[in-house]
Design a protein with these regions (language model features):
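Structural motif
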Residues: 37-44, 76-85
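PDZ/PDZ-like domain segments forming the peptide/carboxylate-binding groove
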Residues: 182-241, 391
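Cleft-lining beta-strand/loop regions that shape enzyme active-site pockets
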Residues: 121-123, 208-218, 232-408
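Non-catalytic interaction/regulatory modules that flank or connect domains
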Residues: 3-7, 11-45
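Extended, small/polar residue-biased N-terminal targeting/export presequences
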Residues: 146-200, 267-275, 280-293
Length: 408
């Protein structure tokens, strides 16, 4: 008893600690995620000495035996076993695992489907199954199972069956998928359109040049590049509108690549620029979409309204809200955009900030001076944009927005 009174602090340095496992008497193993290290760095903490020393590094999975004397760890692709009583895991011995099994995939997929159906039948919180005849649902989807030829097909059917309940936070995860090579096609962070039998650079996407995820490879210091120029070649090969530019960029991911640029649709007279194509344009295009929306709201309102995008109700959403909400306190009102909101927490933080009322102000006697107001924020009217693509906390956010009478 009184376990809370037997709690002691462990004087560890700051770190991203992801795991703690008890070891032999008087020791604890702590897993730390360090920057640039694949897997966890496992430290052995000794209670009597109040110190931690590195035991093994690069552990992906870790388990300690019930008696605390042995540790099994997956390091890279190898499984290793070691004595926990040693100062380090240097005595680790590799465990050879060469297990093979023969599976009847069709029978396995049928079993998975039926078990998933039974899980919902037996454990769904509402015995009435949200008004659905669950046996009827089985008869609807079961005939599709013999036609499944890939795990993706099965996952799609499970998703559709699950969707019959019209309930949130009921997901389909996992599955054995074939291993395939990762795409190595590089992207330029730009819109290319065919024109004059060439690929014209219609738009270069960039927002924050200091952020590698939010800047186009074509928008780097020292590169002679403008929207409206033509991409006429890649790595010495001439490129026409009949060619797929992404085929030319296959294998160029994170590799210095020579592109040929011209103001006119001609290969002759073009110049070369060296760029490093990126793996994804998602964050870049998303930020540009947000900034385009902000500029549009500012233009249509004559500079009176702010635009605040809330991508989710978790960390990223709070960062975006704080960034756009408090930076536009001079606006008379705000358009809050939570379309495509990915959810997270049941928000009260953002709603509470938007529900603030003016408490006080400090006058500013300078010519055209703006009074300093308390509390901080946009205190004028607000409207919330929503769509059907939000979920979880993204569903609760609009409800509480209206419930608190912040706006429509």
């Amino acid at each position: 008893g009184n376990i809370e009174r037997r709690t002691i602090s462990m004087p560890l340095s700051r770190g991203n600690y992801r795991l703690i496992i008890s070891g032999p008497a008087g020791t604890v193993f702590i897993g730390e995620q360090k920057e640039g290290v694949t897997g966890l760095v496992i430290q052995k903490y000794t209670l009597d000495k109040r110190e931690a020393k590195e035991f093994i590094s690069g552990a992906i999975q870790v388990s300690v035996s019930n008696d605390g004397n042995k540790m099994l760890a997956k390091v890279g692709s190898d499984w290793k076993i070691m004595n926990t009583t040693s100062a380090t895991g240097s005595d680790a011995k590799s465990v050879k695992i060469s297990l093979k099994t023969h599976l009847d995939r069709s029978a396995e997929w049928k079993q998975i489907f039926e078990e998933a159906w039974r899980y919902e039948r037996d454990y769904f919180y509402d015995p009435a199954m949200h008004g659905r005849d669950w046996n009827e649902v089985y008869q609807k989807y079961a005939p599709l199972i013999p036609w499944v030829k890939h795990r993706t097909d099965l996952t799609y059917i499970l998703d559709q069956m699950n969707g019959e309940l019209s309930v949130g936070h009921s997901f389909v995860f996992g599955g054995d998928y074939p291993e395939v090579d990762k795409p190595s096609c590089g992207l330029l962070g730009a819109d290319l359109v065919p024109e004059n039998n060439r690929w014209k650079i219609k738009r270069i996407y960039t927002t924050e040049s200091w952020n590698p995820e939010l800047s186009s490879p074509l928008d780097r210091p020292g590169i002679k590049m403008e929207e409206g120029y033509y991409l006429v070649g890649i790595n010495g090969k001439e490129l026409t509108a009949a060619d797929d530019p992404f085929q030319f960029l296959d294998g160029a991911l994170d590799v210095q690549t020579t592109i040929h640029i011209n103001k006119t649709p001609d290969f002759k007279g073009s110049w070369q620029e060296v760029v490093k194509p990126i793996s994804s344009e998602s964050n870049l295009r998303q930020r540009v979409w947000v900034e385009d929306n902000r500029r549009m709201v500012d233009k249509l309102s004559g500079g009176k309204l702010a635009y605040v995008w809330v991508p989710n109700t978790s960390g990223g959403g709070f960062v975006s809200f704080n960034r756009y909400f408090f930076a536009q306190q001079d606006k008379k009102g705000a358009v809050i955009d939570e379309r495509f909101n990915g959810g997270g927490l049941l928000d009260d933080y953002m709603v509470d900030l938007m529900n603030r009322k003016l408490r006080a102000a400090i006058t500013n006697e300078a010519p055209d001076g703006v009074p300093f107001r308390l509390p901080a924020g946009i205190l004028g009217p607000k409207v919330l944009l929503i769509n059907e693509m939000s979920g979880s906390g993204g569903d609760f956010f609009p409800w509480v927005f209206r419930q608190q009478k912040i706006g429509p």
